[in-house]
């Protein structure tokens, strides 16, 4: 199903389908390179959101060469990597949502809504 933005004006939401054998980590690294290097989006305007602490910690450990931080910190040259619930009540211009496909969650609909409503300008969802 296509995503449609109904809030303030911004970019059309993107939904990126993983190819067979491709990891969400690989796609996220390519997205960050595109956003920061090509589109000149400041790193602190980007947040990567995952459903669990395990997933967010995995991203922090494995995103090579990219400075990351938790949402309570504010360093302008770093991308935020956080769980959806930890990021609740905050927003960033660009949200990359990933790992929602790994399992069904008790309240998937509410969790997904919380995640997608954090983007003030551009939402990118990486799906399996």
What is the meaning of each model-derived region?
Residues 3-128:
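Core RecA-like ATPase module of SF1/SF2 helicases and allied nucleic-acid translocases
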């Amino acid at each position: 199903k296509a995503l449609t933005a109904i809030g303030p004006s911004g970019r059309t939401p993107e939904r990126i389908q993983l190819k067979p054998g491709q990891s969400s980590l690989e796609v996220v690294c390519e997205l960050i390179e595109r956003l920061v290097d090509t589109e000149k989006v400041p790193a602190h305007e980007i947040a990567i959101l995952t459903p669990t602490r395990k997933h967010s910690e995995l991203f922090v450990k494995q995103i090579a060469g990219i400075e990351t931080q938790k949402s309570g910190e504010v360093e302008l040259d770093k991308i935020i990597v956080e769980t959806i619930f930890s990021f609740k009540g905050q927003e960033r211009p660009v949200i990359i949502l990933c790992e929602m496909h790994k399992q069904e969650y008790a309240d998937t609909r509410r969790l997904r809504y919380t995640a997608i409503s954090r983007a003030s300008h551009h939402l990118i969802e990486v799906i399996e």
